[in-house]
Amino acid sequence: MRVKHKPWAKDRLEEFPAIYIKNPEDFKGRWQEVFGNNNPIHIEIGSGKGQFISGMAKANPEINYIGIEMIESVLVSALDKAIEAEVPNLRLVARDAKLLEESFEKGEIAQIYLNFSDPWPKKRHTKRRLTNPTFLTIYERLLPKAGEIHFKTDNRSLFEYSLVAFSEYNMLLTFVSLDLHNSDYEGNIKTEYEEKFSAKGFPIYRLEAKFDRD
C-alpha cells in the first residue's frame, strides 16, 4: 500500500498526549498507570486508520486498548477516529512490531490482534510477516498463559502460511473460519480493509490461537 506522506502528522499526534503515547518505552511494565485502572490490555499491531481499534474500545469499555502503527501518516487518521469516538480506554503508539519488547513487560498484554497485515508474498520477505515464528516468539513473551492472538485477513496464502506457522509453533487453534462474514461468529468489528474487500465478494479468513503452555 502506498501511503501519502503527511509532514504534519507527528506534530498533530503530539498535540494529544492523552491519546498518543510518544515514548511508550517509558511505560514498560506500567501501562495500568497510563489507563488508571487494572483492566486487561489488548493491542492491535498494524492499526492502520483505526476503525477496528476505536470500535473495539467503544464496544468494550472494560478493556484497555493500544493501537500500534509504525507509520505516523497513517496513525494520525486513527487519532481522529479516537477523538471522535471519545474512548478513554484507547491509546495509540507509533512503533515497529519488532520493538514491542522495548515497550511492554513480559505477560503485560492480554490479547493481540493482527488484522489484514501486509502479506509480504515474496519468499525472501517471509520473515517480515507478522505471523512468522520470529514474531510469534515476541508475542509469546508478551502474553500471559491464557493470552490469545486473533488474526484476520483476506489473503488466503497468508492465512494458510499462518495456520502452518501457528501449528508448527505448537499453538492451539481455538477458532478457524474460512468465510467469517457467512459464519455464526458474533461481535465482529470490521476494519477499513475488511469493508473494502468483503464488498467485492472476497471471503474473510479468521483464526484465534493461544500458546500451548504447561
UniProtKB/Swiss-Prot annotation:
Keyword Cell division among UniProt keywords: no
Binding-site residues, substrate: K122, D154, T191, E192, Y193, E194
Keywords: Methyltransferase, S-adenosyl-L-methionine, Transferase, tRNA processing
CDD domains given in the database record: AdoMet_MTases
Catalytic activity: guanosine(46) in tRNA + S-adenosyl-L-methionine = N(7)-methylguanosine(46) in tRNA + S-adenosyl-L-homocysteine
Pfam family, one: Methyltransf_4
Active site: D118
Any GO CC annotation of this UniProt entry: tRNA methyltransferase complex
Protein name, per record: tRNA (guanine-N(7)-)-methyltransferase
Gene (UniProt): trmB
